Amino acid sequence: MAENKNQARAGGPGHGPGRGHGYQRPQNLRGTVGKLLGYIGRYKGALIVVAVCLVLSSVGSVAGSYFLKPALNYIAAGNFTGLFWMLVAMGGVFLVSAGCSYAYSRLMVRISQRTVATLRQDLFNRLQTLPLRYFDTHQSGDLMSRFTNDMDTVSDMIGNSFASVVSNLITFVCTVFMLVYLNWALTLITFVFLGLMLLVVKSVGGRSRVSFQQQQAALGSLNGYIEEMIEGQKVIKVFHHEQKTLDEFSARNSAYRDAAAMAQTYAGAMMPAMGNLSRINYAVTCCVGGLLSISGVFDIGSLGAYLLYVKQVSQPVGQISQQVNTLLAEVAGAERIFAVMDADPETDDGTATLVRVLKDGDTLTETDRRTGHWAWKKSDGSLTELRGDVRFEHVDFGYDPEKTVLHDVSLFAEPGQKIAFVGSTGAGKTTITNLINRFYDIQSGVITYDGIDVRDIRKDSLRRSLGIVLQDTHLFTGTVADNIRYGKLDATDEEVRAAARLANADTFIRHLPQGYDTVITGDGGSLSQGERQLLAIARAAVSDPPVLILDEATSSIDTRTEKLIEKGMDSLMAGRTVFVIAHRLSTVRNAQAILVLEQGRIIERGDHAALMAQKGKYYQLCTGQEELS
């Protein structure tokens, strides 16, 4: 594997905030909300309608209750006609309120889905621009969670939580206004109990939040351990560590049980406390209001309406408390998404591009036709023939700027040469090939390609000129032909088949159920490792590159299969500059130059015969005195 794989990965399990209280709050609330508003603000017309419906719905639900005052007074006076029309008016107001509530809910769901779809697309687009270094330091599961869990929380926030908080705030303010309007003195009692409710929310809610955070941490630890143990079952059984695994699981399971019990205890205490305070408030208000009614300060209708508002006023308080915590957790999910989108993209200051040319002697002419000849077109319009001359001059590099893994590396590969890198794992072999295609940029020195500094070549053109077979073969969901064509998207069916024959993959492909049209799923899980590697080699062959990089290309192929592809590989490598990294020294014996690396330095160079005669590191590797990896 590439040497950078041993770098520490940051990010943790990172499964994104959910809908509970226990997740981290956003670090930059204002900035994250501002970015979200930038997305939501694209639907200004719909948002205006939502705002109007939201206000009408909340005000209507409060105003409708006021009709209880005249209704009760009509009953006391025996005016049933007036009562009838008052009930009709009340029903009409509640009907309008319900209609507005339905309308803004539907609109917010639509806005939410469109916003999240745009956000998801922008996030995916950003991932395509990030440098490989970013993926070295962020776990794939953590990045996946931003497309799934975090996107779900953003969708819920826009479609539900935000509108609910605003609606409850409007309802609370309107209800308090009606209480003061009906009897400001009696409202003082309600204010006392509202203050007590806020104290409960602050005290119990704060402890509940901490407990939920501990619960989620324990759950993450438990889930991570389960996943690790499932994947490592073979090792566990080989070393007879079943009991140790069970003991560790029991400890983590107990920790999660205790944390969950504490979290649920606090969560369960919140609503009963709020409910009891609300009922006490209602009882006290009934008694005092009854006395005021008897003394003539209150009529029966005002008392009835007031008591109804007292019942209503405590509901928004508890709901707002819960929704604000949820909303903050959901904003934290959005913040995780924007953290990826704000990451610095892969920079590309190159200007030279790869173009097709007609070659007439030493004269090159740019063309759109397929000629089989390519050239580098510089910013001044001059053309330099693409030949495959690659040179390293005093190159230093480290994945971590403070830790150098390549030291003063100098090498050259002339067009058509085969250069082999050998050495123990971590010596720097794969790192060199990563620098050729500019997956990373060097700290010092220079790398040239046909005499041009690779930093002056556009990355897409540079990588288009390289055929790469990586150690880790990845196949995409699609047909066999599509996976080979990934090396050259406009390749014809005949070019695909020719590449497969060159890699000796044609025989096994034709024995598949649908041949080249056989659909591959699950990263080619139905194919053997050798077959998957053959497809990767065919993918490189179809692009017909002048420079070929084989990173442990035959490491996953058995000896018999390796012999089958040697002839095809020789044809593929003919006339090309080839860089080879291999576990098997037999695959590098015919290289024009073999470079032996140790701890990021080239310690030996020469052909097979010369290096064997030196009886140094290469000799030890060949004779088995040292392991190649």
Model feature map: region roles:
Residues 42-59, 89-96, 101, 160-214, ...:
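Transmembrane helices of ABC transporter permease
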